[in-house]
Structure formats: structure tokens, C-alpha cells
């Protein structure tokens, strides 16, 4: 579970500060998580949409992939940080849950060779963000996830990762 480490650290600090256990329990049960970080948006026709727009580098996206527990289509790409996408492509091939990808943005020429070299072939290229979300939905079977975790900065299409995440949520909330 993503965030388990920080949650356990918070519990330890709360216990050390002598916060009542019932208050700690209530806080853990009601905490909704951090916006744009493995954030559940909505389920549409049996497909769950997860916003990880904060996944602006390969390491963050690897961590997001590790939290997936059902068939997942990932949306990758954005503006370049001149990253090595080989570890990401390898993790996608090795993951029992990453079944497809939609690649968008200025980093498409950097990401697709890494996917090809790793043998990850179930991906589509899109140039429009909304179309990328729609394509990911169409690639994902009922009971699966669409994960926006780009492994890239957002500056080719958006002013910041928050704008990208908010746009993702808006598109998802408009899906029928």
C-alpha cells in the first residue's frame, strides 16, 4: 500500500505525543490521501481511474506501479527530464498487472524505444490528453485500472502537475 510507511511514522509520532488511540484510529480511517498521488478519482463501467499526476519521474511511477493490484493501463509521457526509461519499461514487462500503456507528449520518442527494447508492445500513441484518457479506458477491461502516472514533467501540455491532474479528474468525471 502506497503511503503505509508515512502512515506508520505518523502513528508512531502520535503515540509518542500521547494522542488517544481512538483519535489515531479515526484519523487513519478517514484520511483520504494526498491529491494527485495515487488518488482514486472514480469508477466508470467497472474501470477505476487513478490520478498520480505527481508521478513526474521514473522512480515515482515505479512506486505507483508497485501499488497496482489489478489489470492496469498506464498513461505515460509529458515533457522531458532526459530520463532513462529502460527501468520503467522493464518493470512494466515484469509487472503482473500492467497490461497496456498510452504514451503522450514530448517524451514519446524517448519512451517508446525503451518499451520496444523491453518487449512491451501493448501501447498506443496519442497526441491529445483527453483522447489519451479515452484510449486508456477503451484498452482496460472491466475490473481494471487506468493509472495516470506519467514519469515525466507536465510542461509540454500543462503549467504544472496539479493542472494535469485536475484536467485528468475533469475528463474522468465527464466520462459516460
Give short role names for the model-derived ranges.
Residues 151-176:
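Glycine/aspartate-rich loop-and-adjacent alpha/beta segment that forms the canonical ThDP
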Residues 82, 108-111, 153-156:
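Short, active-site-adjacent cap segments at secondary-structure transitions
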Residues 23, 60, 110-113, 157:
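Phosphate- and divalent-cation-binding pockets in alpha/beta enzyme and binding domains
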Residues 17, 54, 122-125, 157:
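A structural signal for short, well-ordered beta-strand elements
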Residues 1-98:
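Nucleotide phosphate-binding/pyrophosphate-handling subdomain across enzymes
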Residues 76, 147-151:
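Short beta-strands and strand-loop turn motifs
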Residues 21, 58, 85, 108, ...:
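Residues at or immediately preceding the N-termini of alpha-helices
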Residues 86-144:
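C-terminal helical cap/extension that packs against the catalytic core
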Amino acid at each position: 500500500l502506497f503511503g503505509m510507511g508515512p502512515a506508520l511514522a505518523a502513528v508512531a509520532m502520535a503515540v509518542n505525543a500521547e494522542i488517544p488511540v481512538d483519535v489515531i484510529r479515526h484519523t487513519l480511517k478517514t484520511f483520504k490521501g494526498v491529491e494527485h498521488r495515487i488518488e482514486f478519482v472514480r469508477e466508470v463501467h467497472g474501470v477505476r481511474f487513478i490520478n498520480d499526476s505527481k508521478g513526474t519521474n521514473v522512480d515515482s511511477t515505479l512506486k505507483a506501479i508497485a501499488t497496482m493490484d489489478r489489470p492496469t493501463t498506464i498513461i505515460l509521457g509529458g515533457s522531458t527530464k532526459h530520463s532513462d526509461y529502460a527501468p520503467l519499461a522493464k518493470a512494466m514487462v515484469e509487472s503482473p498487472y500492467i497490461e497496456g500503456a498510452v504514451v503522450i507528449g514530448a517524451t514519446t520518442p524517448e519512451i517508446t524505444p525503451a518499451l520496444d527494447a523491453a518487449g512491451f508492445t501493448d501501447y498506443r500513441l496519442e497526441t491529445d490528453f483527453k483522447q489519451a484518457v479515452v484510449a486508456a479506458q477503451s484498452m482496460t477491461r472491466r475490473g481494471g485500472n487506468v493509472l495516470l502516472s506519467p514519469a515525466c514533467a507536465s510542461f509540454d501540455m500543462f503549467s504544472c502537475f496539479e493542472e494535469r491532474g485536475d484536467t485528468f479528474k475533469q475528463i474522468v468525471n465527464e466520462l459516460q
